[in-house]
Amino acid sequence: MRSKHVVLLVSVAGLAVTAGCRSNDTTGPNSGNTLDLSSLIGEMGMATLGASSGVAGVGAVGGFAVPAMPPVVPSTCQYSASIQGFTCAPFTSNGITVNATLFLLDAAGHFQSQPDAATTAAIRNVTDVQGTMKFDQSGTGGSVTLTSHQDLTLSGLLTDTHVLNGSSTSHSDLTVTGTSALHGVTDTKTVTANVTVSKSSRWPTAGTVTSDATTSSQIGSVSVAGTTHSVLTFNGSSVVTMTTTITTGSTPFSSTCKIDLSGAAVPVCN
């Protein structure tokens, strides 16, 4: 049981898909009179909330909270002809730096320099996160170094049903000092598949978010290595199902959790 706890402790929660940038530049895509890009980015975030932590807008590493980054504000991102996308100024908070780039595409897959409600068929959000955050909670200190790359595309914008697909990879290196000293390294890959957002439903009606993580940790003289496989399935309600299998050595441990994405209730697992 202790080894299972260790793997859970150092697993990395998915960083918010809406993590982005801030800038004083206002030459980016105008979402006010054409296409509501802020709303679409919000859809992309809602479609992945709870995939790892079960808490809307909050990430965690080793049980230590990672402050949620602000969402991308489309009007602050500047169009770059060289990449045919909108580059946002880097945003840094608590030692973590986020870089985001937005791409707009028509039905044929061609890049666009401005959003157009009549022709923009998809929005792509590429986010990179890197940095080291230090923490001190209840006498326990340490740091975590994070590196993450996420590439998500929301398509179907010319219809009433939008579909999110994409993937992300992340690497974390956690060091905790004090009475609960430990060192853990986790690598995670997450695949978002056909997460469907309907105009008539507040919550995604279908689709999955699948995560696979490998973890190695050291607590004192105890070394533990393991894997975690989880699948979150959307069904149109705020309460989604996440199945998880954690394996340390040859011993698997499985659980099924009901997660309320609205935050109205704590996750219930068995």
Would you name each region that the model predicts?
Residues 1-8:
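Bacterial N-terminal signal peptides that target proteins for export
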Residues 17-20:
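C-terminal motif of bacterial Sec signal peptides marking the signal peptidase cleavage site
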Residues 11-13:
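Hydrophobic helical h-region of N-terminal Sec-dependent signal peptides
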